[in-house]
Curated annotation (Swiss-Prot):
<comment type="similarity">
    <text>Belongs to the HHV-5 UL34 protein family.</text>
</comment>
<feature type="compositionally biased region" description="Basic and acidic residues">
    <location>
        <begin position="287"/>
        <end position="301"/>
    </location>
</feature>
<keyword id="KW-0804">Transcription</keyword>
<keyword id="KW-1048">Host nucleus</keyword>
<feature type="compositionally biased region" description="Basic residues">
    <location>
        <begin position="302"/>
        <end position="312"/>
    </location>
</feature>
<feature type="compositionally biased region" description="Acidic residues">
    <location>
        <begin position="273"/>
        <end position="286"/>
    </location>
</feature>
<dbReference type="GO" id="GO:0042025">
    <property type="term" value="C:host cell nucleus"/>
</dbReference>
<comment type="function">
    <text>Acts as a transcriptional repressor of the US3 gene expression through a specific DNA sequence named the transcriptional repressive element (tre).</text>
</comment>
<protein>
    <recommendedName>
        <fullName>Transcriptional regulator UL34</fullName>
    </recommendedName>
</protein>
<keyword id="KW-0805">Transcription regulation</keyword>
<feature type="region of interest" description="Disordered">
    <location>
        <begin position="388"/>
        <end position="407"/>
    </location>
</feature>
<feature type="region of interest" description="Disordered">
    <location>
        <begin position="268"/>
        <end position="330"/>
    </location>
</feature>
Length: 407
């Protein structure tokens, strides 16, 4: 006789299975809505539908686009993109990949063992922010360095790999969505899953939309972390504490918000009214107020007071104060950048001023091509064709009778 042994789970608690099924159903329904939209513009509009309008309107193009990063962090990587744009050189894609992989965020992942639900949420948010910042950097490469074939082909392939539900960002987003209560954070889940269905063309062209997304994700994640009971001093780096407290003040998570609002209202209403017994003080204030002349408008000020604008040549410009803080992200562009910053040197081998200043002509042609066009380049050629005034022999005073010179 054959016996068939089966194993069954006789526990009556199926809340975990129902919660998992609900999460899968919510993520699946949101994904179906984006997959049903064929055009990329329709997917973008569907994402904008669930994004609230930022309080300051549209973000500027040169604003910080990294989530939970300081302005200095963003400026460092943005200057690397400007370095590639201004000084084109043969660049290895592996070098760009190393720079992209070094992009992180100021939110530290949790290292506590065993992790609590708040620690898991902190780690998931940190990973999503880091991958989002890397995606933004790749999109900026594709947007600003469109005249370099190697950079464009690399950025196009990287954007294709980093978009979609099967990418590294997609895996981390689904893990974060699984940790969120969908009833309270349905809009955030919709935005996170909507990011995965945007096309590489949208990421490369919609820089303002990226700023809108950054503002929404940063405030939503910070609100989520504070509701989970985490402390800013423990989860963020020290250099980001002031920025985090400023955002908390804006979204109303500090106790001093009400006092600050009362102070702002009192400042807008003006100074308090004086008593009847203080009429003399009011008269003195009126006399002083009427005695001071009204300041002139900028357009009515004398023109001599304005500072004239002078154009300084590139070789005479002084380095900025924070030049030591700037770092070259791409070493292969150092040679080109050093040539552009080099001062022109004048050589005088024969002593008669016959040798032309080739280095000065090259620098003038480079400046003319960037600023004034072909007219300035012709001027640069004429300047280079004339002998340098520094090599002209000086005239000596004649004390003896004038005699004819024999050449």
């Amino acid at each position: 006789m054959n016996f068939i042994i089966t194993t069954r789970d006789f526990s009556n608690d199926d809340s975990v299975l129902r919660a998992a099924e609900m999460r899968d159903n919510v993520a699946g329904s949101i994904s179906k809505a984006y997959k049903g939209t064929v055009r990329a513009e329709g997917k973008k509009k569907l994402l904008l539908k669930h994004l609230p309008v930022p309080p300051g309107g549209c973000s500027r193009r040169n604003s910080n686009l990294f989530v939970f990063c300081t302005e200095r962090d963003y400026r460092k990587f943005h200057q690397g993109i400007a370095q590639l744009k201004r000084a084109p050189a043969e660049l290895d894609p592996h070098e760009i990949q190393q720079v992209t992989a070094s992009i992180r965020c100021r939110l530290q992942p949790s290292l506590r063992e065993p992790p609590t639900p708040a620690d898991e949420l902190q780690t998931a948010v940190s990973r999503v922010c880091a991958l989002f910042n890397q995606l933004v950097f790749t999109a900026q490469l594709r947007h600003y360095c469109e005249h370099q074939d190697k950079v464009v082909s690399y950025a196009r392939d990287e954007l294709t790999k980093r978009c979609g539900e099967k990418s590294a960002l997609g895996v981390e987003v689904h893990q974060l969505v699984a940790l969120l209560p969908h009833e309270r954070h349905r809009e955030l889940c919709h935005v996170l899953i909507g990011l995965l269905h945007q096309t590489p063309h949208m990421w490369a062209r919609s820089i303002r939309l990226i700023g809108h997304l950054r503002h929404y994700l940063q405030n939503s994640f910070l609100h989520l972390l504070m509701n989970s009971g985490l402390d800013i001093a423990q989860v963020f780096d020290g250099c980001y504490h002031s920025e985090a407290y400023r955002m908390l003040f804006q979204i109303g998570h500090t106790d001093s918000v009400s006092a600050a609002l009362e102070l702002s209202h009192s400042a807008a209403a003006g100074p308090p009214e004086a008593d009847e017994n203080n009429d003399e003080g009011e008269e003195d204030d009126d006399e002083l107020r009427h005695s001071d002349p009204a300041p002139l408008h900028e357009s009515k000020k004398p023109r001599n007071a304005r500072r004239p604008r002078t154009r300084v040549p590139p070789h005479e410009q002084k380095p900025e104060e924070n030049e030591e803080e700037e770092e070259e992200l791409f070493p292969s562009c150092k040679a080109t950048a050093a040539f552009l910053r080099a001062e022109p040197s004048v050589s005088n081998d024969d002593g008669n001023g016959g040798e032309r200043c080739d280095t000065l002509a090259t620098a003038l042609r480079h400046c003319a091509d960037e600023e004034d066009g072909p007219l300035a380049s012709q001027t640069a050629v004429r300047v280079a064709a004339t002998p340098s005034p520094s090599v002209t022999p000086a005239l000596t005073p004649v004390t003896s009778p004038i005699t004819p010179l024999c050449i």
